[in-house]
A protein has these predicted regions:
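Active-site segment of SDR-like NAD(P)-dependent oxidoreductases
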Residues: 92-94, 133-140, 194-197
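Rossmann-fold cofactor-recognition segment
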Residues: 49-65
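Conserved Rossmann-fold NAD(P)-dependent oxidoreductase catalytic core, especially the SDR/UDP-sugar
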Residues: 88, 114-165
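N-terminal Rossmann NAD(P)H-binding glycine-rich loop of SDR-like oxidoreductase domains
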Residues: 5-23
């Protein structure tokens, strides 16, 4: 079955790994990908730029004209494929915007919802929403394993910081996704990522590069709110 993938944030940590996995295993797949290089560079997908299965655009999820161009391209190509899958990897992480609650809203909430509506409008069969383990707040990990997907998330005991607003925004996108699926508009799911670290990260947007960069430039790391008492686990993309 031939599949057309439309991926936002395609040069980022998750997006570029998808490009490698899809194109190395599926000769019939095609990827339309875009990124504004918020926390990445073209180098992460450089080996596929001349591959006719990969169309890359330096576009911004929040730019209406650029997203209309993506939509038009999908509509022009859709009849050549058995299935269309949208994957939303674009996100502004909270590390450098810890105390500025509006900085992550436009991309993470509005942008995600607009991209979801585009997927529905073009008749895509599936939409995969990259959410975050931050929705678990301070309980994302503990000696007993932390919360489970089946547990209730109680916002009453959520910490009061940019991490909370970031997590709340991401949680809202999960409800957008669930609502669209329940109404039969599209098939899809939200994936709650743990703290992921990639060797391809060059910019201190995520927590581990932020720590490394702080040590190199300042010789110290400033621990933000609650960072002295919570524990985190990390997954590394090799």
């Amino acid at each position: 079955m031939s599949v057309l993938f439309v991926i936002s944030g395609v040069t980022g940590m998750t997006g570029n790994e998808l490009v490698h996995q899809i194109l190395s295993k599926d000769d019939d797949a095609r990827i339309i990908g875009f990124d504004n290089f918020y926390a990445s560079s073209i180098e992460t997908v450089e080996e596929y730029l001349d591959d006719n299965r990969f169309d890359f655009f330096e576009y911004d999820l929040n730019n209406e004209k650029e997203m209309d161009a993506i939509k038009s391209l999908v509509l022009d190509m859709k009849d050549d494929f058995d299935e269309i899958v949208y994957i939303n990897c674009a996100a502004v992480v909270h590390t450098e915007h810890f105390y500025n609650v509006y900085e992550t809203y436009q991309t993470n909430v509005v942008g995600m919802n607009d991209f979801l509506n585009q997927a529905i409008d073009v008749g895509a069969q599936k939409y995969i929403n990259c959410s975050t383990s931050e929705v678990y707040s301070m309980n994302s990990w503990n000696e007993h394993g932390g919360v489970k997907e089946s547990d209730y998330i109680t916002m009453a005991n959520a910490e009061h910081s940019q991490r909370t607003s970031y997590a709340t925004g991401k949680l809202l996108t999960e409800f957008f996704m669930k609502d669209a699926v329940n109404k039969g508009k599209i098939k899809g799911c939200s994936i709650r990522f743990a703290n992921v670290y990639s060797k391809d990260e060059k910019y201190p947007k995520h927590i581990i590069p932020h720590i490394i960069n702080s040590f190199k430039n300042d010789g110290e790391v400033t621990l933000l709110e609650n960072s002295k008492k919570n524990r985190r686990t990390f997954l590394q993309c090799l």
